[in-house]
Amino acid sequence: HGGMETYMMDLLFSSKQHGMECAAIVHTTGRAAASTVEEYKRDHDQVLVVRAATWFKFLYVPISPSFAWNLSRLIARQRPDVIHLHLPNPSALWSVFIPSARRITWIIHWQSDIVTADSSWMLKTLYWLIRPFEYSALKKARYVITSSPTFLPYSLPLRRFRKKCVTIPLGIRDNFEKSEYHNSIRDRPLRVVALGRLAHYKGYDVLLRAIHRTKNIELDIVGDGEQASSLKKIVNDLAISKRVRLHGAATDAEKDRFLRESDCLCLPSTDRTESFGVVLLEAMSASKACVVSDVEGSGMSWVVDHEVTGLVFKNRSISALAATLERLEQDRQLAIDLGQKGRTKYEQNFTIDQTTAAVLSLYGRRPAISESQKG
């Protein structure tokens, strides 16, 4: 699963450890005729997870006719004090029409806007239909959480609701020990890893063309998605298959191994749809340098401090990315230093305990958040 799913599960289990009773409703990963209910287990703990059947996807949106029924049923079963909606997710907007849901306090976690300047006309048309319900949900919510201060000024849907917006950075649990620094070995190629769904906005085509311009650099792309076949074609057309490997989907343990064995992580996303980049936290927790694009209105270059915890390059620039990677190839100590500072920043700002404490304060379980923290 992707970064948002990782964050959501970490938040659920961390909230449970803080004394909350939690349950989640999500979509099935692939196409499914029937919904499922399971107790999702992790480290002697468990959380109720309802997976609403996804019939198919339209413009990357899961179509799940049973979502509203499953949500009503879950509310009746759990009788929650708070509903925490992770948007964008058109299925979650069924909450607007469910009387039992409307009687409960809502917190919205705004992960990204559905449409950006780069979105297709079809997605923009679909959004025109969804927008009134999205507006109703935002109006009903007590708070709207955004993950970085750089995102909010560029979000058109949130423009009218800035007074209820609160910035809480995402966080993840620590899968790496600080002692696990892996030195970048000079007498082998620089190892770059890219983790995540092969989506249109991820900029992997830019990364492949940049790798083609470099020497002594190897790339592992870990993930699957709609761009897989076009990326394979680029690899073949550029004749870089000896240095580039596309691995497809991987388990969490396999992803951790790829991070451990790499020298740096590259997230070359080209669009504000990449509002934060949870994978950056995974790399920083593993003491790896991060290379990111300077997308305006994204949190990527806020999470990664240029020349401190990573390097930021000009968005969509093949030559700038190639030069950035060459710099790390030439200066392996820089890669190590950036990674170690990234680990420190992760510990100070992006642990799951920190984000959980801030989120629970909005639920009313802790003292109300101070005015200075409101966006």
Each language-model region and where it sits:
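Nucleotide-activated donor-binding/catalytic signature segment of Leloir-type glycosyltransferases, i.e.
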Residues: K232-A253
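N-terminal strand-loop element at the rim of the active site
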Residues: D10-I63
